[in-house]
Amino acid sequence: MTESDDASRETPASRGGEASSNQDLSKPESNHVSLDLKLNDTFNDDTKSTKCEANPRVFSCNYCRRKFYSSQALGGHQNAHKRERTMAKRAMHMGRMFGHHHRPYTYTSSSLGMQAHSGLLHHTLSQPQPLVSRFHHQGYFGNTVPLFFDYDDGGSDFFWPGSFRQVVEEAEAPVVVVASTESGLDLNSVAANGGVDNNSSKPDLTLRL
């Protein structure tokens, strides 16, 4: 046999080996491509989840259209609106019962019968105070209240604090008028016949009611 025949016989075998080696090399490449596809699919899932988280659900208030991101916050906000409206309705109802037509939660000094401090001071200074105090403003022994003390127990005239009647007594019956002032007490002895005798050695200093 010649060398050309041996070369022709070995050529198909060698070709078959080369083809098998090429197939073995192509297998890892196909596996690598499949792995890349799986990674791409997971990446797409992550992007979808992030998009859903970026756009959360929004709840809007029925009264003021304010937006909230949780139903609990929206419920508390709307409950506050309901309480506010209930209080406003109650105030309006009370105003109608008492005849006031003012807005709720708005009170003025004129509606409550109040007067400023300066106005009260001006009103007090503009009116002169009487010399004799009145019973419904001051007590019995207030400022400038005349008190009459009679020495005669059997006198017919009865004097009460604040009386303006003239003192009419019998002869030689002294009357002491005591007027309380801011500085103290003023004592004035008055006698029916010319006053009290200052030259007497033993004056009568006893007071009788």
UniProtKB/Swiss-Prot annotation:
SUPFAM superfamilies attached to this UniProt entry: beta-beta-alpha zinc fingers
Annotated localization: Nucleus
Keyword Metal-binding: yes
GO molecular function, one term: protein heterodimerization activity
Ranges where the record places region Disordered: 1-32
Biological-process GO terms, alphabetical: abscisic acid-activated signaling pathway; glucosinolate metabolic process; negative regulation of abscisic acid-activated signaling pathway; regulation of DNA-templated transcription
Chief location: nucleus
GO CC field: nucleus
Matches recorded under PROSITE patterns: ZINC_FINGER_C2H2_1, ZINC_FINGER_C2H2_2
InterPro entries, per the entry: Zinc_finger_protein_7, Znf_C2H2_sf, Znf_C2H2_type
Keyword Zinc-finger: yes
Zinc finger (C2H2-type): 59-81
Keywords: Abscisic acid signaling pathway, Metal-binding, Nucleus, Zinc, Zinc-finger
Note: Seeds over-expressing ZFP7 are insensitive to inhibition of germination by abscisic acid (ABA).
Function of the protein: Acts as a negative regulator of abscisic acid (ABA) signaling during germination and early seedling development.
Name of the protein in question: Zinc finger protein 7
The gene coding this protein: ZFP7
